[in-house]
Amino acid sequence: MDSKEVLVHVKNLEKNKSNDAAVLEILHVLDKEFVPTEKLLRETKVGVEVNKFKKSTNVEISKLVKKMISSWKDAINKNKRSRQAQQHHQDHAPGNAEDKTTVGESVNGVQQPASSQSDAMKQDKYVSTKPRNSKNDGVDTAIYHHKLRDQVLKALYDVLAKESEHPPQSILHTAKAIESEMNKVNNCDTNEAAYKARYRIIYSNVISKNNPDLKHKIANGDITPEFLATCDAKDLAPAPLKQKIEEIAKQNLYNAQGATIERSVTDRFTCGKCKEKKVSYYQLQTRSADEPLTTFCTCEACGNRWKFS
């Protein structure tokens, strides 16, 4: 199945997204006939489109999509390992150092230069001698004839292209999909403030040096344009920051509960930090009714807090 055939199926999936029967039929065809490669996945964005049905309310569809995505990832990883093994074998083959430019494998009886083989193995990567951006990549981002949308598209392209090995058309396709979804959710003509706010959320998180995985996930389709256009800002945060946000939220909840609930002071509890016995506490039902109450304690001497059930 070539890229043209795959693109037809991608378009049909988009057109028939509300028709479960049609979606299932298309997915089954892709599952049986589509052989995934990094190049095909980038050119067609079939992974992005299929991934949209991962949370379908139709159990058969969601189950099939999860199976397909897992199978495709395995195939890509296997192909990568095979290429790496082949490269390792070539690099360590006897006589390789003597004639790297002329010795190669025979394809249809024609001897291929080793340099050609290396280029072929890197065909999925885009290498530029200049810093990656729309200007240096020769990409026209002024496609909407709308000042704000064109500016946002250019900014998205530039931030996604920076230090990327994905080809320009693939990055442009991703940037267009993100901007289009942003404008669909918050039309820039009728809700400019929300449109700009969403752009700032996406841009600041993608460009952040503390969040290197985000751009990779967007480029590979693991994070979809639909998700980017609607998610909370904290959903894009790196794992350490997410954990800190959760800890702060828990602490705020603890403080809020302690401020509104009457506390009792007792000497029954001992502070594990300062060993004082002047402890205030309150109890809440934080789980199901048949579970024991949770006791929230605060040491009146040092302020140490703990809880137990």
UniProtKB/Swiss-Prot annotation:
- TFIIS central domain location is 148-264
Biological process, per Gene Ontology: maintenance of transcriptional fidelity during transcription elongation by RNA polymerase II; positive regulation of RNA polymerase II transcription preinitiation complex assembly; positive regulation of transcription elongation by RNA polymerase II; regulation of mRNA 3'-end processing; regulation of transcription by RNA polymerase II; transcription antitermination; transcription by RNA polymerase III; transcription elongation by RNA polymerase I
Family annotation (PROSITE patterns) = TFIIS_CENTRAL, TFIIS_N, ZF_TFIIS_1, ZF_TFIIS_2
Point to the regions of Basic and acidic residues compositional bias. Answer: 88-102
GO cellular component, as recorded: nucleus
A single MF term (Gene Ontology): RNA polymerase II complex binding
Give the superkingdom in one word. Answer: Eukaryota
Write down which residues bear the modification named Phosphoserine.
Answer: 116
Bias (Polar residues)? 103-120
List residue spans of TFIIS-type Zn fingers: 267-307
Q: Which residues belong to any copy of the TFIIS N-terminal domain?
A: 5-79
Q: Which UniProt keywords apply?
A: DNA-binding, Metal-binding, Nucleus, Phosphoprotein, Transcription, Transcription regulation, Zinc, Zinc-finger
Tell me the segments the record calls region Disordered.
Answer: 78-142
Q: Where does Zn(2+) bind?
A: 271, 274, 299, 302
Q: Tell me the compartments it is located in.
A: Nucleus
Q: What is its main location?
A: nucleus
Q: Which NCBIfam families match?
A: TFSII (TIGR01385)
Q: What else is known?
A: S-II binds to RNA-polymerase II in the absence of transcription.
The entry's function note states: Necessary for efficient RNA polymerase II transcription elongation past template-encoded arresting sites. The arresting sites in DNA have the property of trapping a certain fraction of elongating RNA polymerases that pass through, resulting in locked ternary complexes. Cleavage of the nascent transcript by S-II allows the resumption of elongation from the new 3'-terminus.
Which family is this sequence assigned to? Belongs to the TFS-II family.
Entry protein name: Transcription elongation factor S-II
Where does this protein come from, organism-wise?
A: Saccharomyces cerevisiae (strain ATCC 204508 / S288c) (Baker's yeast)
Gene name, per UniProt, is: DST1
